[in-house]
Curated annotation (Swiss-Prot):
Pfam families: Aminotran_5 (PF00266). Its cofactor is pyridoxal 5'-phosphate. Converts O-phospho-L-seryl-tRNA(Cys) (Sep-tRNA(Cys)) to L-cysteinyl-tRNA(Cys) (Cys-tRNA(Cys)). Pyridoxal 5'-phosphate binds at residues 154-155, 259, 282-284. Homodimer. Interacts with SepRS. Belongs to the SepCysS family. It comes from Methanocella arvoryzae (strain DSM 22066 / NBRC 105507 / MRE50). The keyword Protein biosynthesis applies. Gene3D superfamilies: Aspartate Aminotransferase, domain 1, Type I PLP-dependent aspartate aminotransferase-like (Major domain). Its EC number is 2.5.1.73. It is an enzyme of class 2 (transferase). It catalyses: O-phospho-L-seryl-tRNA(Cys) + hydrogen sulfide + H(+) = L-cysteinyl-tRNA(Cys) + phosphate. NCBIfam families: PRK09331.1 (NF006810), SepCysS (TIGR02539). This is O-phospho-L-seryl-tRNA:Cys-tRNA synthase 2.
């Protein structure tokens, strides 16, 4: 199926690219000003931009006929899905950049852009211009923890904690719904994962965690050295009893890592109220930031260990890099990733306030109530929803159409795409995941009606 694009969006991108070409003219010029050849190049690009702007305005009558877009960035296709579609992809929704983050990328996209004013003690979290040092303090206060560091994704937060606390052969408690990166972090540190089984509702409980700790102690003769549990897991986005599990961890004297990959940045998170020793979040999943980005926050009790500085001394040069943090490999996010986090932060703080998160969950439940009206469409995640990410089952509805359709499961993708909806797993009509985070009520209602319209088209029963 050939996807046609909105010409106004296409020309908007072309105008943006032409502006970047103008920017390159200035970058290549002398500090004293443009040469005559550079002035001509500038005027040519300005004329090109005016043409695009006129076309964008003219195409506004009826929004223009959709057409195939062949624009390229070198060999790369231009990504326009966020401008052209309602995107319900399960892991992209809350990583969508704010306008401020996109602007920050324009200004700070160069490699070591954070290092313009790096002075002693030569460490990322000590840089004051731009305000990276202050941002680290803001992160810690926002999460109600004592110290925080930015890291290249939540996985690097898991890795840093495991590296600091886990020795070869140590047991680490994780959920039976844990993300693979939690496994890898433990494995790299030489530890062994021990999974807390989920119950019939696909939930991880405090009692089950306590039982697992006892099982580990009985079989190994030692307590686990770390407990890592997701607040909302990636498979179902079910809410797990992190408060109760944190209490169990405290009772046994085991450090507790709160995995907030699906909460930090969209929902209220108070690390000390939870009882967490570590809070890990994902910038590119939930904080409207460029990948890879994330946050690791901890208490003063554990900061000296997880943020320890190097003691290594060169045997020939006698060099020592004492300010560099071992688990973080020194500096972490040295460019546009970090600046996008900083630029998005005010919006992220606002959107994660309780009333805003509650509204997002209401929209998720509204859509799913309409979705469930199609007989045979079910929600596999806990119901009613407490999150915007949801696992659904359409085996008894849209999959019945797929069984006889010449396009098989791809018919569903075709129908959704034709309605301006994208992000479901193309070809999947049995079990799959979606995320409504960030959609307006208008888009939520449009999305709901689109699913019902497809059901009507194929004579699927609707309650």
């Amino acid at each position: 199926m050939i996807q046609l694009s909105n010409p106004r969006i296409n020309k908007t991108f072309e105008a943006l690219f032409a502006l970047e070409d103008i920017r390159e003219v200035f970058r290549q010029s002398l500090p004293t000003g443009l040469s005559s050849a550079e002035e001509q190049a500038l005027k040519g690009k300005l004329a090109e931009i005016r043409k695009y702007l006129d076309e964008i305005e003219a195409d506004g009558v009826g929004n223009g006929a959709r057409q195939k877009y062949t624009g390229k960035i070198g060999s790369l296709d231009v990504r326009t899905r966020e401008e052209e579609y309602i995107n319900i992809h399960p892991i992209q929704a809350a990583g969508r950049l704010t306008p401020e983050a996109r602007k920050a990328i324009i200004a700070y996209g160069d490699g070591y852009s954070t290092c313009d004013y790096c002075r002693k003690p030569f460490r990322l979290d000590k840089i004051t211009k731009p305000g990276i040092q202050d941002f680290h303090g803001d992160l810690a206060r926002w999460l109600n923890m004592d110290q925080a560091r930015v890291v290249p994704g939540a996985r690097r937060g898991f890795q840093a904690v495991a590296s600091a606390l886990v020795e070869k052969g140590d047991s680490v408690i994780v959920s039976a719904l844990a993300h693979y990166t939690e496994f890898l972090a433990v494995e790299q540190a030489g530890g062994v994962v021990k999974e807390v089984p989920k119950n019939e509702q696909n939930l991880i409980t405090a009692d089950a965690t306590a039982q697992k700790i006892e099982d580990v102690r009985r079989t190994t003769g030692k307590l686990p050295v770390l407990i890592m549990i997701d607040h909302f897991d990636y498979m179902f986005a079910n809410e797990h009893d992190v408060y109760g599990i944190a209490k169990v961890a405290k009772q046994y004297g085991i450090p507790f890592l709160y995995n907030g990959a699906y909460t930090v940045g969209i929902a209220p998170v108070d690390g000390k109220k939870i009882g967490a020793d570590f809070v890990v979040g994902s910038g590119h999943k939930s904080m409207a930031s460029v990948a890879p980005s994330g946050v690791l926050a901890t208490t003063d009790e554990f900061a000296a260990k997880v943020f320890r500085t190097t003691q290594m001394v060169g045997d020939v040069t006698n060099r020592k890099f004492g300010i560099k943090e071992v688990e973080n490999m020194g500096c972490t996010l040295m460019g546009g990733t970090l600046l996008s986090m900083i630029a998005s932060f005010p919006a992220v703080v606002k959107r994660s306030q309780p009333q805003n998160w509650e509204d997002e969950v209401r929209k998720s439940n509204y859509f799913l109530e309409q979705f469930r009206r199609v007989q045979g469409s079910n929600v596999l995640s806990e119901w009613p929803r407490k999150h915007t990410l949801t696992k659904v089952d359409t085996t008894g509805s849209y999959n019945k159409v797929a069984e006889t359709h010449k396009r098989r499961g791809y018919f569903f993708n075709d129908e959704l795409t034709a309605k301006g909806i994208i992000g479901e797993f193309a070809g999947a009509t049995k079990t799959w995941k979606l995320n409504t985070y960030g959609l307006s009520w208008e888009k939520t209602k449009y999305l709901s009606e689109a699913f019902l319209d497809i059901a009507r088209k194929y004579d699927l029963p609707i309650n």
